[in-house]
């Protein structure tokens, strides 16, 4: 394929940079639990603003509605990764939500979960990345449009909400270095035993 024949949108500088950052975010989520809570939050604090920036500068696209895109992240995969992050964050996972539409119908403060927000972002980004790897430029462009649309209407708000909570943890008076209690350890071991097979092979050729 010559340089002139490449799709000018899906191979543009902004798209390639977004793909790179999205891949780094997904790697962070997939390896949650392999490092300390503070280290995970420190990396999350840095990559979320970068991810927001990279998707915000993408060119607006048109949708090819007749294209049905495959979903790669199953409910089992989602629950496994969300549980891993919840175990890692422990008592720091929950935070008070201030941008939930349901607040207008509730007299009580609504709570949200960092791990759930990150898992929601991951699900859209991983589906996008896996579709993008097909090399079909029309499908790649549609996947990019879907990812942008979901960002505008859903996971972009989840991103900024979770970033607010992470910022509070990083700079608040919290003992993020405390060891996990026995219950969290037991849950972590159980989650590890149920690790989906696709995680072992998903990026086995990455770096080759």
Where are these regions (language model features)?
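N-terminal interaction modules that seed assembly of large macromolecular complexes
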Residues: 2-4, 9-74
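Acidic, proline/glycine-rich low-complexity IDRs
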Residues: 109, 124-208
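Internal, hydrophobic cores of structured domains that mediate oligomerization or house catalytic pockets
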Residues: 2-8, 94-137
């Amino acid at each position: 394929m010559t340089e002139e024949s490449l799709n000018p949108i899906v191979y543009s500088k902004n798209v390639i940079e977004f793909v790179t950052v999205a891949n780094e975010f997904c790697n962070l989520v997939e390896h949650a639990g392999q490092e300390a809570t503070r280290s995970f939050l420190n990396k999350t604090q840095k990559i979320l603003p970068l991810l927001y920036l990279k998707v915000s500068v993408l060119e607006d696209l048109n949708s090819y509605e007749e294209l049905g895109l495959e979903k790669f992240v199953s409910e089992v995969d989602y629950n496994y990764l969300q549980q891993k992050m919840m175990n890692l964050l422990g008592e720091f996972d929950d935070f008070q939500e201030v941008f939930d539409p349901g607040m207008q119908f509730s007299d009580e403060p609504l709570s949200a979960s960092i791990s759930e927000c990150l898992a929601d972002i991951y699900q859209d980004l991983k589906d996008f990345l896996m579709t993008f790897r097909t090399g079909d430029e029309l499908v790649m462009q549609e996947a990019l449009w879907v990812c942008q649309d979901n960002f505008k209407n859903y996971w972009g708000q989840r991103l900024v909400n979770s970033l607010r909570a992470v910022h509070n943890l990083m700079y608040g008076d919290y003992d993020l270095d405390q060891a996990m209690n026995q219950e969290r350890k037991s849950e972590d071991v159980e989650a590890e035993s149920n690790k989906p097979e696709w995680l072992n092979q998903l990026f086995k050729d990455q770096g080759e």
